Amino acid sequence: MTDPAMWDVATLSTAFGSGSLSPVEVLAAVRARIAAFEPTINALVRHDAATTAALDRESALAAAQSEERWRRGEPLGPLDGIPVTVKENLARAGVAMQGGCAGATPVVPVRDSPVVERLREAGAVIVGSTTMPDWGMLSSGVSSLHGITRSPWDPALTTGGSSAGAGAAAVAAYGAIHVGTDIGGSIRLPGTWLGLVAHKPSFGRVPLDAPYLGRVAGPLTRTTADAAVAMSVLARPDDRDWTALPAHEADWSVETASVRGLRVGLWLDAGAGMPCDPAVRAVAESAGRAFESGGAVVEEIQPWLTPQMLADIDLFWRVRSLVDFE
């Protein structure tokens, strides 16, 4: 694999440390991929010319500063020089946020979100904010503000949502790590539909500002190891989130991980909504057998969701979206 935009974090960091590659060169490779893919997939939030130029200068400076740190042998952290993206609803100081909605008034944050602060502290180079559907309340990449975000595998297909741009950017290799948010599937749907590693952490594990009941931030990556190193950074504490779990130093590495003895629930029938497609059910059953072969204890979960519960959940989300809009 000769295109460094496709490399994982460990490979990039090794190359930076040896001096065989620089963060500046990797940023250039990522920008080349953005220029090639973006007219089709529409994964990044578009800004006016002045803002775009300013953000390009910011990322170029971050890459140059990282290059100098690596030259001195003093990287800031595990993501120094690594190109990343963040979902539009994760604040970047001075970058307008509109929640994917053309009818919303843009909000310009004065401070980076906890996620963005942790990434910068670790030396990451932020190459852009990724698109989302209106208020993040749609399982596709269709937005009244951004238009349609499309799958790099096949532009005729949806990315899933609401971390639509994050998923598309990950497949197109706009960097190694792409941070999305998730309440009811917004990281996991793009991850599943696009063939990525998608991790929804426990509520409160990754600090947010402001915290939002049920919402978490987590990584979309092309490798499990990259998701693990992303979590080692994103899960660091921030006192702005009063719902955060107590800080702890977890070992996020996966090299020696085993599923032996792990309890795995296999949910094949939701009990409400659309029935599961037979082909999808077959894949889920195959995954269950794979876990069993690795020593996990797999148990089928019986349906618990009712049509009334689903209707109530839908009403709840509609009301929350109305509050966001107002």
Segments (PLM) and residue ranges:
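Flexible, glycine/charged-enriched surface loops at secondary-structure junctions
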Residues: 43, 239-245, 292-304
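Acyltransferase
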Residues: 23-28, 113, 251-252, 276-303, ...
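A short helix-breaking turn/cap at a secondary-structure junction
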Residues: 200-288, 305
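Enzymes and membrane/adaptor proteins characterized by extended Gly/Ser/Thr/Asp/Glu-rich
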Residues: 78-115
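Short glycine/serine-rich loop segments
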Residues: 111-234
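Immediate post-signal peptide segment of exported/extracytoplasmic ligand-binding proteins
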Residues: 66-82, 257-265
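Long amphipathic alpha-helix in the N-terminal Rossmann-like dinucleotide-binding domain
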Residues: 53-64, 123-124, 133
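An N-terminal boundary/leader segment
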Residues: 1-61, 293-295
